[in-house]
């Protein structure tokens, strides 16, 4: 039944989220999308308007507000709280046309079988909505396809369906969806929807593009030369694998390209079987043209290609096509992929049963999708370009090589690539692996010498494919090469697939946990050590043969071995590739999972060391190459340097007096003499120019989120971020911006933004800036060794109140932050309230003398001198047990007027304000008097420990440090 009729005739609109809406008036379910249902003035379905510009301009904010208020009233039970009268909440419902439901992410209850899963985000969409959704949510997927599919190489007919505009569609059979699930929603149509990312558009590579479309002779050779992975036989990709039973029939449509990502539903496949209706297609984005290639059934390679993927007669275990379009791997790997391969083969087997068969197939697709979803995690080929190049190279070699490709063609059968792209691929591809034909294949091709490391190296290189050890750089094999001739037919295909050394990893692009990663690195290193000696010996022999070193080297930057080289690969390069583990592997390591910190540590180590350990980038090859290479090696050195970057040596740019002196010196120099050295003078203390660039660009200013690109594409995994941040903090200079040392609340978000200084708050009654409750504690970092814990301890500990820790904050004996403020400013005189336990007899005069002496000291000694003096005599004075230590000694200044006069006092006041502005701990600063008297028992001595040093401090009375000392605490 058409999708529109799914609407319950009783007039209830589709319940969304399980809430039933009342319907005002009864819409009759519209039987064709064209008919005028009350859904808007003209009753156009949104679908028919597709692609038109929206004329009307909404004030989005207004709309959103309305929505919000509506939602609130609805959630509160629908009553308007303002008007308490009996306003019944009337819900007016506008019926959606079924064609439009997809746009709102709804799916009619009965239509659940018509849903397409978006593999990037696992959302459910009807097909119309799916196109819309892809265009909006995953545009990257969209572009990834359309730019790569090769539109219409030889002017072959563009499939008529792809161009249908919405109006034509509606003439063809109502709107697109109403024309009965049998055709629109048939399994075959869905095949283009199968993965949200790329469906199975087989790439046409430039080498083959010209020849492939119509002529049978050239296409057979095309199957040989192209690598089976990317485009070999589009039969394995195009209409997905068809079982051997239906081979003759489906052959004509086998090499059809799906174009565009899922949304364009192009079905030229079932025209003959369907007869009555062409399946309708959504108008695809105009860029993409579907290429329908009808290959004559006589092509030699086609049958082989089919049997390759459905080798057993049982169609249900044929491998799904492996789409090769590159989209971001993260987007593809997540969701459930629904691949219609099975359904299609079922349907094609029994033409006469087809309508029924298809209905059944589409209704039960969820079960099948479950089966398929694991097999079909689409393999993302992130090295597409490499493949294109190698294929081009292949083509060239077939022209220039001593032997042309035709000689190989007859006896070669393509090896199936097991699809290892899933986590537990072994269990899933078991049926395929156990398939007898495949086993025979393997047994025939397996060569034990591959496992024997003592074998000649050249032998191993030839057997790239079966080597346990993946990362050898590919080389093109020559047919005349006596040693390797026998293996050639078997391994040629693999040699192409291995173009990028890590091809095999790339098929298992799933996340690697730390242990595996370590193992992998370890294995690779082992392999290297075993094989290095052999490689070196061979290298010496082959070096004599090599004249065109430079050309080969130049090519190998792009990893295309040059046309004329002997069958040999530069060992240097092999080692490099040995160690490069695909960025995409690293990309996928779970990024915000607190449990995985251990993995992160391993990873961080790997990032810094593994890549660089065994690779000697700077080995001198020979004089000739050196010139060409200089630029390349420089780049390598630079990369190395950045990786081993020593943060401890970082100097942040500062404008202190020191720098000013430097500036003067630089200015006095005649500017022209040494342009190298004459950078901006303030950078003079940076180690290298690169370093200074790092300082200025990355590390100065408010620390913005930082990601260092280790390989050029890698987001930092957590562990690294944390260490970077730690290093930055310790190297930051005092004059740089604030940093909160509160550390990883956010599990190592890199460069978490420090709190900016608190915004000016409303002034207190006395005209001073008040506390800002929001602002946190900040610390001005000096040098890494100075930000030692004692500083932190000092700032973190609460300032404890009088005898009992402070009564109500209002009571005169308790020093609140505000009160301290007033005292410092001289706004309020301090009340001398001798507390009960004091013996204040001779205490006060001593106190004053003490202060005077300190004033003298302040004038005579330099800061460091005083510090030395304070630290010299360590007099361990235990505090009375009950007394918590008072860690912020303040100068008890009885003549307030004097305190106002000298500036250090002002400065101290500012510093204190900064510290005290933290409202989280309610600090009570006890009355100075109190404090000095509590400690009267201890003999005052100028040498006693400065109070901020540890627990041996004696609060207050003895050496009340002057303001300059206090500043040390805060600066």
Swiss-Prot record:
Q: Which GO terms describe its cellular component?
A: nucleus; polytene chromosome; SAGA complex; SAGA-type complex
- List where in the cell it is found: Nucleus; Chromosome
Q: Under which name does UniProt file this protein?
A: Ataxin-7
Q: Which GO BP terms, alphabetically?
A: SAGA complex assembly
Where the protein is mainly located, per its record?
A: nucleus
Coiled-coil features, chain-numbered ranges? none
Q: Fill in the misc note.
A: Shares sequence similarity with the 3 sequence blocks that define the Ataxin-7 signature in other species, however the order of the 2nd and 3rd blocks is reversed in drosophila.
Q: Does the record's keyword annotation contain Transcription regulation?
A: yes
Q: Does the keyword Nucleus apply?
A: yes
Assembly and interactions? Component of the Spt-Ada-Gcn5 acetyltransferase (SAGA) complex consisting of wda/Taf5L, Saf6, Taf9, Taf10b, Taf12, Ada1, Spt3, Spt7, Spt20, Sf3b3, Sf3b5, Nipped-A/Tra1, a histone acetyltransferase (HAT) module made up of Gcn5, Ada2b (Isoform B), Ada3 and Sgf29, and a deubiquitinase (DUB) module made up of not/nonstop, Sgf11 and e(y)2 tethered to SAGA by Atxn7. Untethered DUB module (DUBm) composed of not/nonstop, Sgf11 and e(y)2 remains enzymatically active.
The annotated consequence of gene deletion is:
RNAi-mediated knockdown results in lesions throughout neural and retinal tissues due to tissue degradation. RNAi-mediated knockdown in the retina and the lamina results in degeneration of these tissues and a rough eye phenotype.
Q: Which domain of life is it from?
A: Eukaryota
Q: Which family does it belong to?
A: Belongs to the ataxin-7 family.
Q: Which residues cross the membrane?
A: none
Query: What is the purpose of this protein?
Result: Component of the transcription regulatory complex SAGA, a multiprotein complex that activates transcription by remodeling chromatin and mediating histone acetylation and deubiquitination. Acts as a tether connecting the not/nonstop-containing deubiquitinase (DUB) module to the rest of the SAGA complex; regulates DUB module specificity. Important for regulating deubiquitination of histone 2B by SAGA. The SAGA complex predominantly acetylates histone H3. Important regulator of transcription during embryogenesis; required for nuclear anchoring and cellularization.
Keywords assigned? Chromosome, Nucleus, Transcription, Transcription regulation
């Amino acid at each position: 039944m058409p999708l529109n009729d799914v609407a319950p005739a009783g007039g209830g609109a589709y319940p969304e989220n399980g809430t039933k809406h009342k319907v005002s008036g009864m819409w009759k379910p519209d039987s064709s999308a064209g008919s005028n249902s009350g859904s808007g003035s003209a009753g156009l379905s949104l679908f028919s308007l597709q692609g038109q510009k929206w004329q009307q301009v909404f004030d989005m904010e207004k709309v959103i507000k309305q929505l919000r208020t509506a939602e609130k009233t609805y959630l509160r039970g629908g009553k308007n709280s303002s008007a308490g009268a009996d306003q019944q909440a009337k819900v007016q419902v506008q019926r959606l046309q079924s064609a439009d439901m997809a746009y709102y992410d709804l799916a009619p209850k009965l239509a659940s079988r018509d849903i397409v899963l978006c593999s990037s985000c696992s959302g459910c969409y009807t097909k119309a909505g799916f196109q819309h959704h892809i265009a909006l949510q995953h545009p990257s997927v969209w572009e990834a396809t359309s730019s790569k599919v090769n539109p219409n190489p030889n002017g072959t007919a563009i499939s008529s369906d792809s161009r249908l505009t919405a109006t034509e569609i509606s003439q063809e059979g109502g709107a697109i969806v109403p024309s009965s699930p049998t055709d629109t929603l048939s399994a075959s149509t869905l095949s283009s929807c199968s993965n949200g990312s790329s469906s199975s558009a087989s790439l046409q590579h430039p080498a083959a593009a010209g020849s492939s479309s119509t002529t049978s002779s050239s296409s057979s050779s095309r199957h040989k030369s192209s690598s089976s992975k990317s485009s070999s036989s589009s039969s394995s990709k195009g209409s997905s694998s068809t079982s051997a039973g239906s081979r003759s029939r489906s052959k004509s449509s086998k090499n059809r390209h799906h174009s565009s990502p899922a949304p364009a539903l192009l079905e030229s496949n079932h025209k003959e079987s369907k007869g009555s209706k062409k399946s309708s297609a959504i108008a695809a984005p105009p860029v993409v043209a579907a290429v329908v290639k009808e290959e004559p059934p006589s092509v030699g390679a086609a049958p082989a290609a089919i049997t390759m993927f459905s080798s057993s007669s049982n169609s249900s275990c044929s491998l799904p096509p492996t789409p090769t379009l590159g989209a971001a791997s993260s987007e593809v790997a997540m969701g459930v992929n629904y691949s219609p391969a099975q359904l299609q083969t079922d349907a094609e087997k029994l033409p006469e049963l087809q309508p029924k068969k298809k209905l059944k197939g589409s209704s039960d697709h969820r079960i099948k999708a479950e089966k398929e979803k694991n097999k079909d995690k689409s393999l993302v080929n992130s090295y597409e370009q490499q493949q294109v190049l190698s294929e081009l190279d292949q083509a060239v070699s077939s022209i220039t090589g001593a032997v042309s490709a035709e000689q190989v063609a007859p006896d070669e059968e393509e090896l199936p690539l097991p699809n290892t792209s899933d986590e537990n691929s072994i269990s899933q591809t078991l049926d395929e692996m156990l398939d007898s034909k495949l086993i025979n294949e393997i047994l025939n091709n397996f060569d034990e010498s591959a496992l024997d490391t003592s074998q000649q190296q050249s032998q191993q290189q030839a057997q790239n494919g079966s080597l346990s050890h993946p990362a050898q750089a590919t080389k093109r094999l020559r047919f005349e090469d006596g040693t390797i001739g026998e293996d050639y037919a078997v391994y040629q295909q693999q040699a192409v697939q291995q173009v990028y050394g890590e091809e095999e990893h790339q098929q298992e692009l799933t996340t690697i946990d730390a242990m595996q990663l370590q193992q992998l690195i370890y294995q690779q290193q082992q392999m290297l050590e075993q094989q290095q000696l052999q490689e070196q010996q061979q290298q010496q022999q082959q070096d004599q043969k090599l004249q065109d070193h430079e050309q080969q080297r130049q090519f190998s930057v792009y990893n295309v071995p040059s046309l004329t080289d002997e069958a040999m690969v530069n060992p240097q390069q092999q080692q490099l590739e040995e160690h490069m583990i695909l960025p995409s592997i690293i990309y996928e390591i779970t990024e915000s999972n607190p449990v995985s910190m251990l993995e992160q540590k391993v990873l961080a180590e790997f990032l810094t060391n593994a890549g660089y350990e065994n690779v000697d980038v700077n080995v001198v090859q020979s004089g000739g190459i050196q010139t060409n290479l200089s630029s390349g090696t420089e780049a390598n050195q630079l990369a190395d340097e950045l990786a081993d970057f020593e943060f401890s040596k970082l100097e942040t740019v500062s404008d202190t007096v020191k720098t000013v002196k430097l500036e003067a010196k630089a200015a006095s120099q005649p500017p022209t003499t040494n342009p190298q050295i004459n950078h901006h003078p303030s950078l003079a203390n940076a180690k290298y120019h690169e370093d200074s660039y790092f300082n200025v660009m990355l590390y100065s200013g408010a620390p913005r989120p930082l990601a260092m690109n280790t390989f050029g594409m890698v987001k930092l995994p957590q562990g690294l971020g944390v260490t970077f941040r730690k290093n930055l903090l310790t190297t930051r200079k005092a004059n740089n911006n604030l940093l909160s040392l509160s550390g990883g609340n956010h599990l190592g978000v890199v460069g978490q933004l420090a709190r900016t200084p608190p915004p000016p708050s409303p002034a207190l009654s006395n005209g001073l800036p008040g506390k800002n409750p929001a602002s946190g504690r900040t610390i001005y970092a000096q040098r890494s060794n100075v930000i030692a814990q004692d500083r932190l301890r000092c700032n973190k500990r609460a300032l404890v109140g009088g005898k009992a820790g402070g009564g109500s904050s209002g009571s005169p004996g308790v020093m609140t932050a505000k009160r301290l403020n007033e005292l410092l400013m001289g706004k309020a005189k301090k009340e001398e309230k001798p507390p009960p336990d004091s013996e204040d007899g001779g205490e006060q005069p001593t106190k004053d003398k003490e202060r005077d002496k300190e004033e003298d000291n302040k004038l005579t000694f330099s800061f460091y001198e005083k510090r030395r003096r304070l630290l010299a005599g360590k007099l361990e004075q235990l505090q009375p047990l009950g007394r918590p230590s008072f860690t912020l000694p303040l100068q008890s200044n009885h003549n307030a007027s004097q305190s106002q006069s000298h500036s250090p006092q002002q400065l101290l006041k500012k510093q204190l304000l900064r510290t005290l502005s933290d409202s989280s701990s309610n600090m009570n600063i006890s009355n100075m008097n109190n404090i000095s008297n509590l400690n009267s028992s201890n003999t005052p001595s100028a040498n006693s420990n400065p109070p901020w040093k540890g627990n041996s401090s004696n609060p207050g009375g003895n050496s009340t440090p002057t303001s300059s000392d206090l500043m040390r605490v805060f600066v």
